Every structure is written in C-alpha cells, then in structure tokens.
C-alpha cells in the first residue's frame, strides 16, 4: 500500500536549484562585499587623517623657518603675529616712557624678547628704524624687562643708556627721553 503522504514525484532537472548551497553562497557574497566596502572606507579615512596630520605638521614646521606662514589671525588689525604673540611696530616716535604708555593703552607692553628666533623676527620686521623694547635699568643695576624679570643676556646691549632699543645691528641703549619708534607685544591668547 501506498501512503498518500509519501507520494513520489518526478522532478525535472530544471526544477532543481542550480547549486544546493546557492542561498547560503549569496548571503556569504553580500556579507563579504559589505566587509570589503567597510575595509576600504576605513582605509580611505585613515589616509585622509594621515594626510591632514602631515599637512598640519609641515605648516607648524614652517612657522619656525618662515614667520610669514604663521601670521596670527587672532591679532588685532595692524598687529603682526609670531610664535603666539602679537607685535605692533609703530610709525610714530616717542620717548621710552610714552612708548610704554601707548603699549599699556593697547593692553600690551613694550616688547620682551624671549628667544633668538623672536629677536631675528623683530630685527627683520622693524626695518631700518630704531625701535624701543621693554628693557631698562636703573643706574648701576641689572637690566630688567618691563614685567620685572631680569634680562638673561640672550644678546648684547651696546651703549651706556638706561633704556634698550633695537637698531639695524642688534640692541643698544639710550636715555629714556630720546624719541624713537617702538614695538609693543602681547600674547595672542588675550586678543
């Protein structure tokens, strides 16, 4: 006897799946494609980030070699940025005390030179005119910056005056009442 539930049916070859694992293979292929796409996306983003880091590093390295690359947008108009400071180079002339008063009115001081690179920048940028800086001394006393710290002899100061200025050869000194151009400086953080 034949059970009606167990009926054998003839199946033609066209009705058979081409590959018995075909459904599993398609799922595997889709997953593999997604994994490769994700891998390439991660690689692309990694290359972009590395390129940005390299570009920023190159710009930062140029800051020390070529100051014009690093002009600070944070500085007020007519001030020049260099190594996280803003500098103002006057066109007018005043004595040392009046020059400091002007700088003070701008929330700044006469320039304090903190490195050899900064000195070179100031000497190049100031042009041929002499400019007061924030270094002075009382008769027979050591040189002090406007903020009260002692000068550490980073560069020679010629002359016997009580106030320092930059000329075309470096630093020199003169009496406080002599009129010269001046350089103010302030941190670009305060701008």
UniProtKB/Swiss-Prot annotation:
One GO BP: cell surface receptor signaling pathway
C-type lectin domain residues: 82-185
Residues that span the membrane, as ranges: 39-59
A Pfam family annotated for this UniProt entry: Lectin_C
GO CC terms, sorted: cell surface; endoplasmic reticulum; external side of plasma membrane; membrane; plasma membrane
PROSITE patterns, sorted: C_TYPE_LECTIN_2 (PS50041)
Induction notes from the record: Up-regulated by IL1A/interleukin-1 alpha and prostaglandin E2 in cultured osteogenic sarcoma cells.
GO molecular function: carbohydrate binding; transmembrane signaling receptor activity
Iron keyword on record: no
Entry keywords, A to Z: Cell membrane, Disulfide bond, Endoplasmic reticulum, Glycoprotein, Lectin, Membrane, Receptor, Signal-anchor, Transmembrane, Transmembrane helix
Endoplasmic reticulum as UniProt keyword: yes
Organ and tissue specificity: Detected in peripheral blood leukocytes, osteoblasts, lymph node, thymus and spleen. Isoform 1, isoform 2 and isoform 4 are expressed in T- and B-lymphocytes, and at lower levels in NK cells. They are also expressed in B-cell lines and LPS-matured monocyte-derived dendritic cells.
Cysteine pairs bridged by disulfides in the record: 75-86, 103-184
Localization: Cell membrane
Glycosylated residues (UniProt): 95, 147
Positions on the Cytoplasmic side per record topology: 1-38
Record's comment on post-translational modification: N-glycosylated.
Entry membrane topology: Single-pass type II membrane protein
Extracellular topological segments: 60-191
Function comment: Receptor for KLRB1 that protects target cells against natural killer cell-mediated lysis. Inhibits osteoclast formation. Inhibits bone resorption. Modulates the release of interferon-gamma. Binds high molecular weight sulfated glycosaminoglycans.
Protein name (database record): C-type lectin domain family 2 member D
Species in which this protein is naturally found: Homo sapiens (Human)
């Amino acid at each position: 006897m034949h059970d009606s539930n167990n009926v054998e049916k003839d199946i033609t070859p066209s009705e058979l799946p081409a590959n018995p694992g075909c459904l599993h293979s398609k799922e595997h292929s889709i997953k593999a494609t997604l994994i490769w796409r994700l891998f390439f996306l991660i690689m692309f983003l990694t290359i972009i980030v590395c390129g940005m880091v390299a570009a920023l590093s190159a710009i930062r390295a140029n800051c020390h070699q070529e100051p014009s690359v690093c002009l600070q947008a944070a500085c007020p108009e007519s001030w020049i940025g260099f190594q996280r400071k803003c500098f103002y180079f006057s066109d007018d002339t005043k004595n040392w005390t009046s020059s400091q008063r002007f700088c003070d009115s701008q929330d700044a001081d006469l320039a304090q030179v903190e490195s050899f690179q900064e000195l070179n920048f100031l000497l190049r940028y100031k042009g041929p005119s002499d400019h007061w800086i924030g270094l002075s001394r009382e008769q027979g006393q050591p040189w002090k910056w406007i903020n009260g710290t002692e000068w550490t002899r980073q560069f020679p100061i010629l002359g016997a005056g009580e106030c320092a200025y930059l000329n075309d050869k470096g630093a020199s000194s003169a009496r406080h009442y002599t009129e010269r151009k001046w350089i103010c400086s302030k941190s670009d953080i305060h701008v």
